[in-house]
Amino acid sequence: KTKVLIDNVAMLYDKGRIDGALIVAPKGVVSTWYKQELPAHLPDHIENVAVLWQANINKKQQEKLDTLFKTGHDLHILIMNVEAFSTEKGRIFAAKFLRSHKSLMAIDESTTIKNPKAKRTKAIESMRTLSLYRRILTGSPVTRNPLDLYSQCEFLDPYHLDHTSYYSFRTRYAVMRTANIAGRSIQLVSGFKNLGELSDKLKPFSYRVLKEDCLDLPGKIYMKREITLTPEQKKVYDEMKQTALATLNGKRVTTVNALTQLMRLQQIACGHFTADDGSIQNIKNNRIEELMDVLEEVEGKAIIWCHYQRDVENVFERVSKRFGPGSGVHYYGGTLPEERDKALKNFKENPDCRFFVGTPATGGYGITLTVANTVVYYSNGYDLEKRMQSEDRAHRIGQKKSVTYVDIITDDTVDTKIVKSL
């Protein structure tokens, strides 16, 4: 879908219809657009200036941003993460760019704007009329219910679905029931209706291709979602890296050897920290949010592999909170032996149980998980055998689809070295 959009941008530019493109994508994808997708797919004859938005603007970054407003015949491309639209600085700059160009605005992984009440959704919707052309890209336009379509389609054109109000749209396509919770009467969605009609309305302005329809796809497809350290993580990470010591909540940690240091650096990148006294401290991090963004785009079931037991616990807790109790199972050292068979059976047979969270050390051997064709590596280890074995839990006899593997990587950390070594 990325190449299709870039081809569309190139065509519109060649015809003189646009001279600017604003690409909005999740945090883990923006650098891929900048470093890989545009250089690989934008035709060589198109002179362009592409700039990746950064929240902390220094003098060098400001100079790059300024090049987007220089007159000339170049195609100007601004790439921003969707979270930037939750900030005043990001909203102001995006609006300035759109007003200064004949532009196309595209939202990659557009389910990030499915919530009509979210600040970023409202900000993006408010800029809709500043662009001449609008596009959305997603691997799964309906994540949990068809109502998620409203904001995505409204960004394209508020008249596409014949509803200019979310509530009139909901009335047409959702079955509502009244529930009394804590003494309050609220409306809840209990089902859906008129979905055939909704599907017909989508067809004139959408194009959908299933992975199984792409006969030339390889058996395994690899993707990366890159994130950055939070300020708190970076402080602790840099201290560990430079001095082999880190202090968190008053606990002093020393490295015993190079392997221990690498492990502790990765733990920090993953959002937790094991002190010498054995206590584990959590650190605010971007990794868990990136995982949630990935899982929102998944159709069907997914396997999430974690290198550390703490990762499994944090991920399982967050999955249960986001997608509901019973939406996942865990399979690691902390899972009692008598519970493991139940977890496997539940994941394989229960359609509501969509996520398998485990460690390659425990779940990477001898079990079949072909009900899933998406595998996310929340964190990796250096053991190539465990990586290959864990990959093959989904990619084996019984799998009828291509399997997509997603590595979540914290940029400029030991993460990149680990994945490169694999």
Report the location of each language-model feature:
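Substrate-gripping "pore-loop 1 plus following alpha2 helix"
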Residues: 92-93, 99, 112-125, 384-385
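Walker B catalytic acidic pair
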Residues: 108-109
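Conserved P-loop NTPase motor "coupling/switch" region that bridges the ATPase
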Residues: 18-21, 39-55, 103-104, 121-213, ...
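A short beta-strand element within the Helicase C-terminal
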Residues: 148-151, 367-380, 403-407
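Conserved helix/coil segment N-terminal to the catalytic DExD/H
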Residues: 58-77, 82-101
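A conserved SF2-helicase RecA2
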Residues: 382-422
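Conserved Helicase C-terminal RecA-like lobe
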Residues: 1-26, 85, 98, 216-367
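Short amphipathic alpha-helical segment within the helicase RecA-like ATPase core
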Residues: 31-44, 147, 314-317
